[in-house]
Amino acid sequence: MRSIPTSVVTLLLVSSMVSGCVSDPTKVDTEEDNPVEVDPDYEPNISEHCTDYDELERCWLLLVPLILNESAPAPLLVDMHGNGDDMYQQRWTSDFANISMEQGFFVAYPQGHNNAWNHGSSLIPCSDELRCSEEDDVGFILQMLDTIMQNHSVDKSRVYVTGWSNGCGMTQRLAVQASEVFAAAGCMAMYRFAEVQSDYSPIPFMEVHGLLDEIVLYATTAPAAPVFGPEKGAIQNLESWADLNGCQGSIPEVIVSEEDYDIRGYTDCENEAQVMLVSLFFAAHNPYEHDDPVADPGRGWANPTGVPSSTIVWEFVSQFSKKSNESIIM
């Protein structure tokens, strides 16, 4: 069993409270058989799709970059918005769209029910005061992937998942409850609360977190325990994933050290997996290079030194692939 010195944990800091931005739920009424173009401000290669799942209409945006040659299978990244945002805002904020148009991979932006995801923290029920989701979001995402794969040339060995805040919690739920589907996961500003499936097989994981995060504290979630559940922090989350992936080493090694961020983690893990934490020294809850359009005070500001967090995540996840291309159909 690995153990981490108390001195490592006590290096951490930060302040604050739980909150979520509120915006009107996304109104979508398109049919899967007839995908429509999104708003003219978007590239013409982004389309909106919907399907019925669990008696609800569930929708997503799909970016097929113009440089993609669909005669050959290409990777697919699932990118999930945070609580109170929607798929349109995530497409703008995360910047994975620009990366995909340079490097040639699909990006799917699913829409959470009531602008939220069921990321697996269910100690208290959803309410008007606490916007969250109690839907089968794992099942919805898998159905969305199956639909995309039926209509596009996706490399099933290179399906990745990312997200921000509540979407990062959902990323980690998918990683531990559908590890047979995803080659790697990397996300922003949230910890893992979902239960791990008995058939979990270690996959690479990276989390990006601002040291000054005022919503999901870097050091601990103790002030928000009624919402988030058992106490977590960025280092605890890293260590939890290292245990889960059977990583060797008593403390994380420093992989990259810069003036405004560092990357530390474990590289010797089961299944050739890795576990990484990217700490942004001057960032708050939004670690991206773009401001969040919802922009509640303090929540929407981008990381002030321009750390290319999305590029870091993509370069990490995209180096991994599954050894098997089995169908995701359950």
Segments from the language model and where they lie:
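Hydrophobic alpha-helical segments
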Residues: 1-25
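A domain-start/cap signature at the N-terminus of enzymes
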Residues: 21-22, 26-76, 102, 106, ...
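Serine-hydrolase catalytic machinery in alpha/beta-hydrolase-like enzymes
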Residues: 51-61, 71-160, 164, 170-173, ...
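Alpha/beta-hydrolase-fold serine-hydrolase catalytic core, especially in secreted/extracellular enzymes
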Residues: 55, 203, 242-330
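Alpha/beta-hydrolase
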Residues: 78-80, 188, 280
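Active-site rim elements
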Residues: 127-132, 220-230, 296-304
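Short beta-strand/loop motif that positions the catalytic acidic residue
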Residues: 207-209, 213
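Acidic catalytic loop of the alpha/beta-hydrolase fold
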Residues: 213-216, 285-287
